[in-house]
């Protein structure tokens, strides 16, 4: 027996999970070595950890508000892209194209700095609507930006519902609107939820861009302390680890949600083919 | 068919063109109350398109469709045509080859969906009506299951119940047993036979089940290259067809 055969025979004794655990442990050891190589000032890091952590609630708040704004925009965008009404179709086509085609950071600045310049044209009582705080600007920009991306997700979800479903609904006398609301959308939303979870996780990280206009969220706090004491890497490592932890937690819940959603569509229990 | 009774379905000069392919070449068809008409013929002869023109899932290129006194004249879409289209659809029930049950709804929800959404029937009343439909097709015990947990035969019977719940004037069947495993065909045909013979339902059926046609149909109509070229009671048509194309097809399938 050569070495390779002997290794394979040995390896067969251990489960995949055990081997996977070993790989993860080795990765963490490597990360620890890398961390040590940077000779970070750990006392400094521990000292400012609570200050940076205090940005977490705002980061989560901005992300949740952002996704709550993005979902209805995405739904409208998707329906518009599929609509035969030229005005609705044109506006949503522009929305998706322009917003996906320009950087989020530019959009944030346009809403935060650009909108107030238009306030002078608005009637007095409405001027306040053009001058937004950093958090509102950030939520608006994130919601509008992610709405454009998610419009494509929802559109694919709607198109994934077979034409037979539409025909069955129409054969029963349902109008186009009834067919969409009662038959197509419920099925489209089910397939759209997992990718929407992905977008939410991406949004948690992109909320750091809102820090650039001065929102006291996670990234803003980390970079502020880093610049103040010329120890940027220390605070940014903390921020990175916190973002990783946050997204891991949401990934876990996303996985559970996906399994739960699959349930209604899986043949389970006794005798699916019983007569 | 009583000659003086107004037909439930009346097609006049129905043509349907897809691109440069003329699938229907001016078909006339009358179906009287309580009548069962089986349309048969080779695949690609236009049978399904003809059936789908009755409830306007396919809009005829020219000609007219009348169902239960609601008349639809071919032409560009406008408010009047769309409303006639919906009126006709709510008076016809359709059963598809591949069932097309709504997978996100339970069996009873599938059945009450249209009565509640289209006819604005109160849910309790729709439930009673839905249960009667399910009992008629023998799947009342599955009312809370989701379609994925049903066999093909059960799915098709639920689809029949869903169409019946709209209390249609005419039931359209588009190859209702073609997607079924052979051992499940019988239960669906039995339900259809019961609808035809016991309940006196007006039916237009596109099928390859010649045994069913001979036993249940009042009239059989042979479709060939976009035309209905011969029709008559099964007893006359089978063995006594005048057109050689009908004779050849019947000899091949029987």
Segments from the language model and where they lie:
Chain A
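Transmembrane alpha-helices and adjacent helix-loop boundaries
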Residues: 1-275
